[in-house]
Amino acid sequence: MIPPNATAVMPFLTTLGEETAHLQGSSATSLARRGPLGDDGQMEALYILMVLGFFGFFTLGIMLSYIRSQKLEHSHDPFNVYIEANDWQEKDRAYFQARVLESCRGCYVLENQLAVEHPDTHLPELKPSL
């Protein structure tokens, strides 16, 4: 003799199969879409949301722990030490100031004495020939 199954899945499947065999057309598809207890899928949606929530929480935890381990692992990297030291900014600033001073040495201002002495005088312009 076969011991009884405590989950009772087989009788549910057999009754569902018998019901769908008797029905035809669109009523069979609507029965297949309906939940087994007729609760319109409220518990199924809750289950899916719980699974997605656990998955998201687990994934977020892994991501944050990985990011933290990468920060701790690379904190003594020479590149990061160089960036944090701000030596490069001071060198850049000194180089930029030297370039500005070098370019200013070549700068000079031409002064038009006629325009300074007689600012009301009209200066003639050349008209382009056609």
From Swiss-Prot:
Domain of life from the UniProt record: Eukaryota
Q: What is a single Pfam family found in this protein's UniProt entry?
A: ISK_Channel
- Which GO terms label this protein's molecular function in UniProt? delayed rectifier potassium channel activity; potassium channel regulator activity; transmembrane transporter binding
Which residues are recorded with the post-translational modification Phosphoserine? S103
Q: How does it assemble?
A: Interacts with KCNB1. Interacts with KCNC2. Associates with KCNH2/HERG. Interacts with KCNQ1; targets the complex KCNQ1-KCNE1 to the membrane raft.
Tell me which parts of the chain lie in the Cytoplasmic compartment: 68-130
Q: Which UniProt keywords apply?
A: Cell membrane, Glycoprotein, Ion channel, Ion transport, Membrane, Phosphoprotein, Potassium, Potassium channel, Potassium transport, Transmembrane, Transmembrane helix, Transport, Voltage-gated channel
Glycosylation: which residues? N5
Question: Which lineage?
Answer: Eukaryota, Metazoa, Chordata, Craniata, Vertebrata
Record localization: Cell membrane; Apical cell membrane; Membrane raft
Answer whether the UniProt record assigns the keyword Ion transport to this protein.
yes
Please describe what this protein does. Answer: Ancillary protein that functions as a regulatory subunit of the voltage-gated potassium (Kv) channel complex composed of pore-forming and potassium-conducting alpha subunits and of regulatory beta subunits. KCNE1 beta subunit modulates the gating kinetics and enhances stability of the channel complex. Alters the gating of the delayed rectifier Kv channel containing KCNB1 alpha subunit. Associates with KCNQ1/KVLQT1 alpha subunit to form the slowly activating delayed rectifier cardiac potassium (IKs) channel responsible for ventricular muscle action potential repolarization.
Describe the PTM.
Answer: Phosphorylation inhibits the potassium current.
Write down the membrane topology.
Answer: Single-pass type I membrane protein
Q: Does the keyword Membrane apply?
A: yes
Family named by the database record? Belongs to the potassium channel KCNE family.
Protein name as it appears in the record: Potassium voltage-gated channel subfamily E member 1
Q: Name one GO cellular component term.
A: voltage-gated potassium channel complex
TM spans (from-to): 45-67
The biological processes this protein is annotated with in GO are: membrane repolarization during action potential; negative regulation of delayed rectifier potassium channel activity; potassium ion export across plasma membrane; regulation of heart rate by cardiac conduction; regulation of ventricular cardiac muscle cell membrane repolarization; ventricular cardiac muscle cell action potential
InterPro entries reported in the protein's UniProt record: K_chnl_KCNE, KCNE1
